Curated annotation (Swiss-Prot):
It comes from Dechloromonas aromatica (strain RCB). The PRC barrel domain binds ribosomal protein uS19. GO terms for cellular component: cytoplasm; ribosome. Binds ribosomal protein uS19. Signal peptide: none annotated. An accessory protein needed during the final step in the assembly of 30S ribosomal subunit, possibly for assembly of the head region. Essential for efficient processing of 16S rRNA. May be needed both before and after RbfA during the maturation of 16S rRNA. It has affinity for free ribosomal 30S subunits but not for 70S ribosomes. It is found in: Cytoplasm. It holds the Pfam family RimM. Residues 97-170 form the PRC barrel domain. InterPro entries: PRC_barrel-like_sf, PRC_RimM, RimM, RimM_N, RimM_N_sf, Transl_B-barrel_sf. This is Ribosome maturation factor RimM. The keyword rRNA processing applies.
Amino acid sequence: MTGNDIVVLGRLADPYGIQGWLWLYPFGDDPLAWAEMPVWWIAREGEPWRECRLKSLKAHGNGVVVLLDGVADRTAAESMKGVLVGAPREALPTTEKNEFYWTDLIGLDVINTADERIGKVVGLIETGANSVLRVMGDDKVERLLPFVSAVVLAVEKEAGQIRVEWGSDW
């Protein structure tokens, strides 16, 4: 499966306990639903995707922890830190109007209301309160724009751009 067929859903974080559990850093709003996917796709950034079986997923405190097949102890879990978790696009529900998978936003040009190009979306950050667009300008300066309706006016995937209320000098 190619990287274009996979939608990145989250990232594995720190180990939890000594039996191979890992904290999951989801890029979406319903990671408990991922338990319905018995096979996940995992990869480090820039590496090929491979299948991995989910053994267990549960809410814990304010987060989610997962146990993956082949990750038997804390040492194995430590080696998984930073690994991306994804799923084939066809296995995911279609998005509603004004809903987006993060992967669909990466690469879009960001244009402000004065028709000035701010840059290109290179990633997103989840802060808890809202998502934040990581926008790399032509000047190689990264700008962080909150993904909220007061800033993001329109996402025009077909046109390859996001319209924002944001000054070019920020």
